[in-house]
Structure formats: structure tokens, C-alpha cells
Amino acid sequence: MARSKSDQAFDERIAKNSEELHELLTELYGEQADEAFRNLTELMKSSYAARPADLKRLDTKRLADPEWYKRGNMFGMTMYTDLFAGDLKKLADKVPYLKEQKLTYLHLMPLLKMPHPQNDGGYAVEDFDTVDPSLGTNEDLAALTKKLRAAGISLCLDFVMNHTASSHRWAKAAQAGDPKYQDYYYCYDDRTVPDQYDAVVPEVFPATAPGNFTWSEQMHKWVLTSFYPFQWDLNYRNPSVLVSVLSSVLGLANLGVEVFRIDAVPYIWKELGTNCRNLPQVHAIVRMLRIVLECVCPAVVLKGEVVMAPKELAAYFGTPEKPECHMLYNVSI
């Protein structure tokens, strides 16, 4: 069976970007890069194959108009689903009202599965692949995005790259003693390495969550928790973490999410002896995320949350030859 023009274009995007993708993986993972590259390539192919036809048509449209999100008529709104409508189904009923307001961009605050009540407003994620049951289902989210698209409204969701909730299945497996999943996080038997980190790494919330590490009584280990004790930092030195996270991003894109606000992105790579902020490896990961999205779902836009000094911001756009984020978000500017 002959490949469609859309399929051929996907093949061309993969071929064009494979060399750079492998180089970036090698930069981060050395001898593990080949396996990571195979896994990531298979993920991109399977995610593209699973992408709904209407979203592939949107990809084609956006490729012809790559700066669509910069148009002067873009008008956005941010809201909590439950406060505005109750749940995703009820929000879908309000799409005609949003269209009447000339809305073209809707940012829904975190709605993926989270622990209750302690969840940092949804930024402690228990499952990157599932809508929180209090708000609906994945099918409800897909139905909402379809209705929004028909009304000319693009949906933005947060994606928390730096950490998971301590109740995430990976963290639970780590707590149960599984070394595979302990390597998804930063876990230490004693204070030797944590003390070395603490000597140079500033605290994010010194008043409300002092310290960068939390003792897990179940594991009898210290765990890196840059934000709150119930948010465990992911270990991107493990290529399985990167591939797993990218799988979740692509899954949400295939539900119709058009913009991802990637949360706390400057923090995602840790290097002993540094302040663990804005490291070169962070930019390598963001560049890979951009490449993967451009290959599989080029309609999707990246908005990086970079709450750092203004001099740090421009680097997150990347370069014209190797772009990273399409847009940046800084609450202090």
C-alpha cells in the first residue's frame, strides 16, 4: 500500500532530524545513546501512526503557516476547569460562549491525575497519561479539544517535566525497593551526596519547603525534592526517563493538545558542583523535545516556563538553526 503524502512527509522529517537527535542523545548518554535512539525512533513512529487523521490535517495546515501562534488576533485565557465549569464535559458545553468572546487560545491549569488534597495545585502529577477523575476522562479531553478546534481555539496544557508526585507509580515502585525505578529519581543511602548538592544548590521554597532532599522512611534513602517533599525530581541521566516522558507528551498531543507549557524546565538536569539551573543538558533535552514534536505532531507549540533572570531567557528560544521553545513564560516580567 502506497504511503500518503502526510506519511511521506513524516518519513522525511524523521530522516532530516535523525542525525541531530542521535548526536544529542550521545551528548547526554554516551554508550546508552544507541538504545535510546532506537526506543525514541520507535516511539515517534508508533505515536505518528496513532495520531488521529484530523490532527494530521492540522499538522499539514500548521506546516504551511508555522507562525500561526504569533498572529495579532490571538486572544488567550487561563482557567481552572473545575472553577469555571466543574469538569471537562461541562467545559465543552461552554465552548460557544468562549468563541463569542473571540478566544483563540485556552490554557487549562493542571488536570492530569494528582493526589488529593496535597498536589501543589496539580503540579504534583500522579499519572502523566491520565486526566484526573475529578475532572473527567481522556475521552472527555479529546472531545473537548475537538470542539475547541472547530471553534478556532487551541488548547494549552501544563506538562511538569521536573518531577512526579511521590504517589506516582514509578515512585511507589522505588519506595517498594525496585532499583529500576529508584534510578528514575535521585536516591541516596546517606547524606554524603545530598550535602554536596546543598552546599551549592539554592532552595526553591526556603520558607515553606526548606532543604533539597527528603528522607523516605520506606526506602531508607534520601530523595531529591527540589520543590516540595511530595514532588520527587526525575533523573534525566536515565534515558528511560526521557523516553517515558516524551511518550506521555506525545500521547497528550494525540488527544488534541496544541500547546505545552513545560513547567520548571531550567531545573530538569542536575550536575554536582553546579547550581543545577539552566545547564547545557537542559537545552539539549528541550531541543530534543522540539525535534520530536516537529517530527510527529508539527502543529504543536512549546511554551517554556523559565522563571529565571532575564539574561537567561533568550537561550531557551534556541537558535534559528536549532530552535527550542516557540514561546517563553516568565511571571516576573
Language-model segments: residues:
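Active-site regions of oxyanion-processing enzymes, predominantly non-cytosolic
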Residues: 252-253, 258-262
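Short, intrinsically disordered, charge-balanced linker/junction segments flanking boundaries
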Residues: 331-333
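Acidic/aromatic-lined carbohydrate-recognition and catalytic surfaces
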Residues: 1-243, 254, 265-327
